[in-house]
Amino acid sequence: MKRKVYWKDLFASFTHSKGRFLSILTLMLLGSLALVGLKVTTPNMHRTANQFIQQQKMLDLAVMGDLGLDQADQEELLGVKGARVEFGLLLDLTVKGTGEAIRLFSPPKSLSSFRVTKGRLPKKEGELALASFWEDRYQIGDTLTLEEKAGTRSSLKRKQFTIVGFVQSSEMWSQKNLGTAMSGSGNLDAYALVSKEVFTTKLPAMARIQFDDLRSLDSFSQVYQKRLEAHQEELEKLLKDNGKARYQRLKQEADGQIQKGQKELSRAKGTLQSAKSQIDQDQQQLDLQEAQFKELAPFLPAKEQAASQEKIHQAKEQLDQKKKDWATGETELAKKEEELKKAQRERDQLEIPTYHVYDRKTMPGGQGYLMYSNASSSISAVGNIFPVVLYLVAAMVTFTTMTRFVDEERTNAGIFKALGYRTRDIILKFVLYGFFAGTIGTLLGTLLGHYFLSGIISNIITQGMVIGESREYFYGDMTLIALGLSFVASVLPAYWVSRKELKEEANLLLLPKPPVSGSKIFIERLHFIWKRLSFTHKVTARNLFRYKQRMLMTIFGVAGSVALLFAGLGIQSSVGGVSKRQFQEILSYELIVVKKTNASSRESKELTNRLEKSDIKDYRPIYSKVVEASLKGGRDKQTITMMVTDRTDFSPFVSLRSLKQGEPLSLKKGVIISSKLAQLARVTVGDRLTLDDHTFKVAGITENYVGHFIYMDQASYQKIYGKQTSANSYLLKLKNPSTQQVQTVSQDLMDLAAVKAVSQNASMISLFNSVAKSLDTTMMILVVVSILLAIVILYNLTNINVAERIRELSTIKVLGFHNKEVTLYIYRETILLSIIGILIGLGGGYYLHQFLIAMIAPDAILFYPKVGLGVFLFPVGGMLLLLILLGIYVDHYLRKVDMLEALKSVD
C-alpha cells in the first residue's frame, strides 16, 4: 500500500499543531538542559583539574615538621616505596612598607612545579619570581624588599630582590584565599620563588610526595581518595615517633653544645683568674719598684735616674695593657655566660616537634583546591535531584498533551483504519510525533547543557583560580541518558495513549468520542453547601472531577513547578542566611591569637599589654588545638577545632545554643560539639564520640554552619585527657571590627615575639563564599528553568482544556453568556486546580529543599534550614501572575472563536 497520504498526514500534524509540538520540544529541552548542564559541569571541572595536576606534577601528600626535616627524617621519607619525594624550603616574610605577608619557596625540581606566566624563574640569589596576581602592582625589573619578624634569627642572606618573572603555584589554586601565614596580619597575601642559595638554612621545611599508584587516577574519585587515605595513614605511622626521636637528638645536641660551652667557659675563667693573679703580682712589683725609686732617686745620677724611670714607665704600660686585655676577657666571658644561659633556656624550652601529613586540601595554601572540590561536589549533588523532578513533571504534561492529540486525530485514525492501514501504522504516527518533538528538544538541550550551561557554572567557580576556565567536553553517555529519558517522557506516553484509544473499530473511531460521564460528587451530598452555589460554580465543581486526568496533571504540573521554584529559591535563602548567623551571631570574635609556648615572661607581658589597649574591646584566654579525624558521614578527613575555657561558656565570643530551639547551652553539663560534626559523626546528645584517641559523652549540640568545633571546660578536659591544660590562645573582640582595623591589629600582634600566629575568620568566610557563589548562580539558572517550565505547563494544559471543550463553551455562549462568564466558566477550573497545585507545591518544595541542602552541603558546611518569607511569596506571586496573563490570553482567544462553526457536528 502506498503511504503518500499517510506521510502527508503525518507532516500536516506537525505543521497544524505547532504549539503542541513546541511545548513538548520545550519541555524536553528544559529537562535535558538541566540534566546535562548540571551533570557534565563536575566531570568537566575534574578533567580540567586532572590535566593541570598531571602537567604540573602536583604532589599527593606533603610532610611538614614544626622544626623542619633533618637528615634522619629525610632518609626515612626517601625510603617510602612507590613514591617520589622532593624536599623544599619555604619562609614567611612581610613586604617592606605594606606589611603584607609573602611566602618564599625554593624552586621545586619536578613535583608541584610553578607555571611561568611572564618572564622567567630566578637563577641568581638576588632574583625573584612573584605570584602572577600581583602583576598589576609590580613589573619585571622592579625591586621588592622584604622583612623578617623582629627578634627572630635571619633566615635569608639578603632581603632585596629584583623581579624577573611572574608565576602560578600548582598547590595554591585560589588567588584570593591563600590561607594563614606566620607573618604580616596572619593571612597570606602572596608567594614568590627565590633561589635556594638565598636561604641560610639548608634544613628543608617540607617534603612533597607523589605516589606511583595514584598518578594515573582521577584525583576526585573515590578510588584515589581511599588509596590516598591509606598512604596518609602509613606516613603518619612512619612519622609517629619522629617527634620524640628528633627531640632527643636536639636535646643531646644542645646538651653537647652546652657542655662544650661550659668547658670553654671554665677554661676562660681559669685563664682570666690566672691573668688576674699575674696582674696583681705585676702591680705589687711595680708598686715596689716605684717606692724604691722614690727612696733612691735623690742619690742616683741623672742618667741612671732616667733609665729607672723609663723602666718603670714601660712596666706600667705593660700592666695597663694586661688590665685592658683582662677587662676585654671579662666582657667576653660575660657574653659567653649569657649565651650559655640562653642556650640552656632554649634547651629547657625545647618541645617535642609535631610532624604533619597534609593532602592537597589541608596543606598550607590548599584552600583553593578545597573550594574547587567542594563546589564541584555540590553542583553534582544538585544534578542528581533537580532534573529528575523536572523530567517527572514534563512526562506528566506530555502524557496529557498526547492524550489530547490522539483525541483530535480520532477521526483521521478511523479513516486510515477504514482504508486498510494497520493499527500499528496509525500508532506509529503518534510515536513519531512524540519522538521528533522529544528528540529535537533533547538534542538542543543537550548541546546547550554541554556548551552553555556547564560553562557558565564552572567559570563562576573557577574565577580567581590559577587553574583557569574549565574546558568543555562532549559526553556521549549523558546524551544517551537524556535521549532515554526523553523517550520515556515523550514517546512512551504517545504509544501508550494511542494504543489504548485506537483499539476500537474504524466505524467507532469515525464517531466523536463519547463525553465523559458525570457522577455525583461529594460536595453534592452536602446540601447546605450545594444549594448555595451558583450554576457556573456547580458546573465547575462537577467538571473538576469529571476530567480527573486533566485535574491531576494540572495539580501535579503546577505543584512540580512550584516545588522546583521553591527549592531553588530556598537554597539561595539558606545559603544567604548562613554568613550573618555564623560570623555575627554565633562566632562574634574577630581574631584568634595563638601564643608561643616558649615565650619568656617579658614577651608574655608585652602581649598582655597589647591586649589591654583600647582598640581591643574584650579578650578571653582559652586553650585550643586542632584535631583531624575520619568520620562516618564524611568524604575526607575532617579538621576539628577544640576550645577549652575555665568558665561555663564562651560568651560573648561564641554563642552556644541549640540548633532548633535556640536555647543557650552550658559547659557545666559536659562537652558540646557543633551541629555538622554531630551529623557527620552520626551522634546525638547522650552518645559517646571518639576523637583524638579519647572518648567522651556528647552533652550538647550547638548551632554552627561553617567548620567543626568541640567546646568544653577545664573540668571536662581533665576528665577526658587526665591532665590540666593552660591557655595557649586568645579570642579577641575589637571595638572597630572593620576589615582594615582587623588587618591593622593583626599586624601589630604578629610583630610581637610571644605571638605564634593570628587567625582571622576570613578563611572560613572565603571557604563558605566560594560554595555559596557557585550554588547561588546555579540556583538562579534553575529558578529561570522552573519559571519557563511553569509557563509551558500552564499554557499547554490551558490550551488543551479549551480545545477539548470548545463545543461546550460555544453552547453556553449562544445561550447568552457574556464573554467574561464564558472565560470564567472554563478558566475557573484552572485557577482552582492551580491554587491546589501551588499549595501542594509549597509543601513538596519545602521537603525537596530540606533534602537538597542536606545533599549538596560540603562536609564542613551546614546550610541554614529555614527560608525567608520571599521563598514562599515569590512562587505564589509568580504563579498567580502567570494565571492572570493566561486568563487574559484565554479571554482574548475565546472572543475570536467562531462559535457556530465550532458547534457543527462531526458525525
Spans of features found by a protein language model:
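Short cytosolic juxtamembrane segments of multi-pass membrane proteins
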Residues: 2-4, 502-521, 892-907
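Membrane transport/envelope proteins' first extracytoplasmic loop
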Residues: 3-392, 578, 582-591, 702-785
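Small-residue-rich transmembrane alpha-helices
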Residues: 399-404, 409-411, 435-467, 476-503, ...
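Juxtamembrane segments of multi-pass membrane proteins
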Residues: 535-668, 675-676
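C-terminal transmembrane helical bundles of large multi-pass transporters
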Residues: 728-733, 746-854, 858-889, 902-906
